[in-house]
Amino acid sequence: MRHLLFALLLLAGLARAELPETDWLDLMPPEDRQALEEMPDISHDSPEGNSLFYGTNGLRQQNPDLPAVMYSSKTVPELDGKAVRLGGYPVPLESDAQGNSTLFFLVPYPGACIHVPPPPPNQLVLVHYPSGLRLDDIYAPLWVSGKLRVESVSNELADAAYAMDAREVRAVTDEDLD
């Protein structure tokens, strides 16, 4: 009986253990990573109105001055169905009746999709989180855990090459940074 109780306690602890962090660059195939590392820095400080990423009609358009890697939808097939934990920033898309965000893009840097340019599609994850999360500050980083899917998603803000049904979403704490 003791051994059974110990095994159950051990399994319960393992079930609650956090997944190791997945790096955003792991979502890109090696050739995209290399192209991204070789391109010049992009300013994320300009307002969208001054950007070449939006046409006069307000719709997204590609900037011909940027390399193709900035629009890459190439994915890493081995990640399809894999349980991951990604750290990133939310871009809210839908909320429930209480104002909690239930659908959002998770992006690797703050201000993405709000200040341009948006990340490449293979650097955006559409997160479904039916439990909802109160987002008081979209510039505060989150940890999102769940099964990653290779899934092409498009809306007026951006295109994503991945989606996730999150099982846990939480704010990054000071202890996480130690």
Question: What spans do the regions from the language model cover?
Answer:
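Hydrophobic h-region of N-terminal signal peptides that target proteins for export
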Residues: 8-17
